[in-house]
Swiss-Prot record:
It catalyses: adenosine(37) in tRNA + dimethylallyl diphosphate = N(6)-dimethylallyladenosine(37) in tRNA + diphosphate. This is tRNA dimethylallyltransferase. HAMAP family: IPP_trans (MF_00185). Its EC number is 2.5.1.75. Catalyzes the transfer of a dimethylallyl group onto the adenine at position 37 in tRNAs that read codons beginning with uridine, leading to the formation of N6-(dimethylallyl)adenosine (i(6)A). It comes from Rickettsia bellii (strain RML369-C). It holds the Pfam family IPPT. Belongs to the IPP transferase family. Residues 36-39, 160-164 are annotated as: Interaction with substrate tRNA.
Amino acid sequence: MPKKEIIILCGPTASGKSYLGHALAKACDGEIINIDSMQVYKEIPIITASPPESYKSEIPYHLYNFLPITEDFSVVKYLKLAAEKINQVTASGKLPILIGGTGLYINSLVFGYNNIPDISEDLRQQVRKLHNEIGNTELHNRLTKLDPLASSKINQSDTQRLIRAYEVVLQTGKSIFSFQTLPKEQILSEFNFKIIFLNPERKFLYKICDERLANIFKDGAIDEIALIKKQFNPDYLNLKAVGIKEILAYLENKLTLSEALNLAQTRTRRYAKRQITWFKHQIKEKITLDYSNEEDFLQVTRKLSILIDLPNSNK
């Protein structure tokens, strides 16, 4: 029996994934499923450039902006939710189209994942209380005693990873990195993944990155982050989306708005460069779509269903 198709549309930030994926879903009777680790959070749709409501009104979108920013989210949790949505979409006769640039999620979905046990809520609260009392440096020192491997790999300024590693070693008695040596678990072995990699020319991509981030700053991102700062302690939130730290620094009068934007643009370009390198080296079997200007991109959009040899539907 032939395997069912799943499309994964990936690429660096600002490469046009959302636009292209939306057009593809409309052309091929598909539904969109998020595969971006930051676009799951409901309080930050602007800074994460989540798909607009106009897109969501035309076709079904799944796993976008549904999770409170206070809730921890792991690759295992994502995979379970994604598998449910993929099975639901295919059961309805539609084509699942996954869009995003989070390499860990894509790699785990396609090639399998290391299943790290869930952390109990009691322990999670205890570790956060401890961190609040002793800070990053002392928590890193304590991690060194319990898990020297993790402490050597995790910078003490990386609060989220530091807390996560400390939780895991307390919960399991094992290093968080020890789980990487275990056999990987596959959850969608009955599917065939067709991976499309958007590969814009570097200079063109950087131009789009700068323009998009400037628009994001103008279109409400500052108010969005100001509200989060008012309601929550940012130290305990999963605020890794580029631009958030810079806006927080602006709100705390540590940077001017221009400095915050310039710094965020620089970080975005560096992030895009790392993404391109990762996709080129980690995902060997893929369809690469190259383009160097807006006209090239529009041509790719018009011809995509032909280029990747897709039927009009997955029925």
